[in-house]
Swiss-Prot record:
<keyword id="KW-1003">Cell membrane</keyword>
<dbReference type="GO" id="GO:0050922">
    <property type="term" value="P:negative regulation of chemotaxis"/>
</dbReference>
<dbReference type="GO" id="GO:0010888">
    <property type="term" value="P:negative regulation of lipid storage"/>
</dbReference>
<dbReference type="GO" id="GO:0045722">
    <property type="term" value="P:positive regulation of gluconeogenesis"/>
</dbReference>
<keyword id="KW-0904">Protein phosphatase</keyword>
<keyword id="KW-0597">Phosphoprotein</keyword>
<dbReference type="GO" id="GO:0070373">
    <property type="term" value="P:negative regulation of ERK1 and ERK2 cascade"/>
</dbReference>
<dbReference type="GO" id="GO:0004725">
    <property type="term" value="F:protein tyrosine phosphatase activity"/>
</dbReference>
<feature type="modified residue" description="Phosphoserine">
    <location>
        <position position="304"/>
    </location>
</feature>
<feature type="modified residue" description="Phosphoserine">
    <location>
        <position position="320"/>
    </location>
</feature>
<dbReference type="GO" id="GO:0005886">
    <property type="term" value="C:plasma membrane"/>
</dbReference>
<dbReference type="GO" id="GO:1902215">
    <property type="term" value="P:negative regulation of interleukin-4-mediated signaling pathway"/>
</dbReference>
<dbReference type="InterPro" id="IPR003595">
    <property type="entry name" value="Tyr_Pase_cat"/>
</dbReference>
<dbReference type="GO" id="GO:1902206">
    <property type="term" value="P:negative regulation of interleukin-2-mediated signaling pathway"/>
</dbReference>
<dbReference type="GO" id="GO:0019905">
    <property type="term" value="F:syntaxin binding"/>
</dbReference>
<feature type="modified residue" description="Phosphoserine">
    <location>
        <position position="339"/>
    </location>
</feature>
<dbReference type="GO" id="GO:0008286">
    <property type="term" value="P:insulin receptor signaling pathway"/>
</dbReference>
């Protein structure tokens, strides 16, 4: 099975057909209604205007006045895998995010982006980074940090999610891949697979509990890559026929735009081919992935890491160690990436608009609070003024009565 995919990979590489294959997938993908995402009251719950959940597969918040969240349930029955793919939470949707995690009985959150990338906000800080808990009063949840395990390119947090109303608590694993660039790919299949199997070992992807929540910034590019590779490897482990293109098209029926670039598609093939070695019974492969990923090194500077990974995958710096492991060149054939670049520029504009909108919303909230305080003062001012006037009269009367008492009553008592 992996040999077939490897031959397909080599042919696509030799013929420089990654761009045409990506366009084929995009053109063959079905477009389903996504009306709820466009409702006026839901506009501020979407990070990007062009990334919306389909109506038939969107996750619905239960017991909420508005059940909308930009999240999709991707259900691959033959692999017994279910994922919730969602956008990076906004400041005003963090509370909805944790409500969804609770209601869906999720055991793990897989985060594939950083909160800020290339000076653009990609995701709100929805989990605590120190001992102070985060409280989300709107939906009645609090989150505490229990532990943190920092590796060179990913971090694992253990979080305690508490339902404030019932007092019930759950432990949530938070797997954070910290060096995967937007519209890009991980440094190598080995490092990615080491991370994927770390998530797998936690049992969080198993079907005996709620679906794992997978997110990046938009919830389609990096999230789609992660889900596609995991699904294909599960099917290979089950001995099923694996057609990567058809599986991706099937997954795109649940959430639009999964995998955003030809590079991400190519990397998915590389990771599937490399991951298939584990399904063949190579007991030492995971150990080699861990060694090649160099996860135990100290985390590097984010900016230099981001640049290194981009150069490496564009063929300017080739990882020789990884090539020895996979037998596949990490150099990508030159392709016309105009559509991807235009999407990236559009995404940057959307990020700026979203950041501006958030600042405007915060300013409006401050102005509204100031206006409420002013109205309260205007309401109470005449009452307090009258009360003050009455108090002055009462005090004056009391003082006058006291003086009158001293002048008239006390002399009589003295004479007596």
């Amino acid at each position: 099975m992996s040999a077939t995919i490897e031959r397909e990979f080599e042919e696509l590489d030799a013929q420089c057909r990654w761009q045409p294959l990506y366009l084929e997938i995009r053109n063959e993908s079905h477009d389903y209604p996504h009306r709820v995402a466009k409702f006026p009251e839901n506009r501020n719950r979407n990070r990007y205007r062009d990334v919306s959940p389909y109506d038939h597969s969107r996750v619905k918040l239960q017991s909420a006045e508005n059940d909308y969240i930009n999240a999709s349930l991707v259900d691959i029955e033959e692999a017994q895998r279910s994922y919730i793919l969602t956008q990076g939470p906004l400041p005003n949707t963090c509370c909805h995010f944790w409500l969804m995690v609770w209601q869906q009985k999720t055991r793990a959150v897989v985060m594939l982006n950083r909160t800020v990338e290339k000076e653009s906000v990609k995701c709100a800080q929805y989990w605590p980074t120190d001992d102070r808990e985060m409280v989300f009063k709107e939906t009645g949840f609090s989150v505490k940090l229990l532990s943190e395990d920092v590796k060179s390119y990913y971090t694992v947090h253990l979080l305690q999610l508490e339902n404030i109303n019932s007092g019930e608590t759950r432990t949530i694993s938070h797997f954070h891949y910290t060096t995967w660039p937007d519209f890009g790919v991980p440094e190598s299949p080995a490092s990615f697979l080491n991370f994927l199997f770390k998530v797998r070992e936690s049992g969080s992807l198993n079907p005996d509990h709620g679906p794992a929540v997978i997110h990046c910034s938009a919830g389609i590019g990096r999230s789609g890559t992660f889900s596609l590779v995991d699904t294909c490897l599960v099917l290979m482990e089950k001995g099923e026929d694996v057609n990567v293109k058809q599986i991706l098209l099937s997954m795109r029926k649940y959430r639009m735009g999964l995998i955003q670039t030809p590079d991400q598609l190519r990397f998915s093939y590389m990771a599937i081919i490399e991951g298939a070695k584990y399904t063949k019974g190579d007991s030492n492969i995971q150990k080699r992935w861990k060694e090649l990923s160099k996860e135990d090194l100290s985390p590097v500077c984010r900016h230099s890491q981001n640049r290194t990974m981009t150069e490496k995958y564009n063929g300017k710096r080739i990882g020789s160690e990884d090539e020895k492991l996979t037998g596949l060149s990490s150099k990508v054939p030159d392709t016309v990436e105009e559509s991807s670049e235009s999407i990236l520029r559009k995404r940057i504009r959307e990020d700026r608009k979203a950041t501006t909108a958030q600042k405007v919303q915060q300013m409006r909230q401050r102005l509204n609070e100031t206006e409420r305080k002013r109205k309260r003062w205007l309401y109470w001012q005449p009452i307090l003024t009258k009360m003050g006037f009455v108090s002055v009269i009462l005090v004056g009367a009391l003082v006058g009565w006291t003086l009158l008492f001293q002048l008239n009553v006390l002399p009589r008592l003295t004479d007596t």
